[in-house]
Amino acid sequence: MADSSFDIVSKIDRQEVDNALGQTAREIATRFDFKGTGASIEWQGEHAIEISASADDRASAVLDVFKTKLVKRDVSLKVLDASEPRQSGQQSKIAIALKEGISSEDAKKISKLIRDEGPKGVKAQIQGDELRVSSKKRDDLQAVIALVKQQDYDFAVQFTNYR
């Protein structure tokens, strides 16, 4: 029987993030408490978002609205790396970086966890910014998925290519 396998990845669904950003922009344009604050949220390049408002608390409120919209769209908040509000002239700005991919150190942690606590006969291979897990038994792979889901990593984890 051939080996079964799946990949452990940390990817961002950019379309869902873009939809959440658009919803947030519409909400802050219509909400009364944001009138006259100059609050805005927009993309800054491919993997960064910038929030600006007239005060720190308004910028933080926009960030909270954005996080709420992301959660409703099933995007993990672990992909966000938000800075503290900083003053830039009359505006308060928050820079948000989007984290994607599993670093080699994190991949090694997951691989060690699978070797130490996972079922026997399961192999984990690091392939760039993802991890390929393979085994002869599909039940073992299900056990590995449950094991990895139990852990609380500081990055989002998805399971793809289950075969």
Curated annotation (Swiss-Prot):
**Secretion signal, residue range per the UniProt entry:** none
- Please indicate which superkingdom the organism of origin belongs to: Bacteria
Q: In the record, what terms sit under GO molecular function?
A: nucleotide binding
A Pfam family that this protein carries is DUF520
Question: What keywords were assigned to this record?
Answer: Nucleotide-binding
Sorted alphabetically, which InterPro entries does this protein's record hold? DUF520, UPF0234-like_C, UPF0234_N, YajQ-like_sf
A cellular component annotation (GO) from this entry = cytosol
Q: Report the function annotation for this chain.
A: Nucleotide-binding protein.
Similarity annotation: Belongs to the YajQ family.
Q: Which PANTHER family match?
A: UPF0234 PROTEIN YAJQ (PTHR30476:SF0)
Identify this protein by name: Nucleotide-binding protein Noca_0564
The scientific name of the source species is Nocardioides sp. (strain ATCC BAA-499 / JS614)
Q: What is the lineage of its organism?
A: Bacteria, Bacillati, Actinomycetota, Actinomycetes, Propionibacteriales
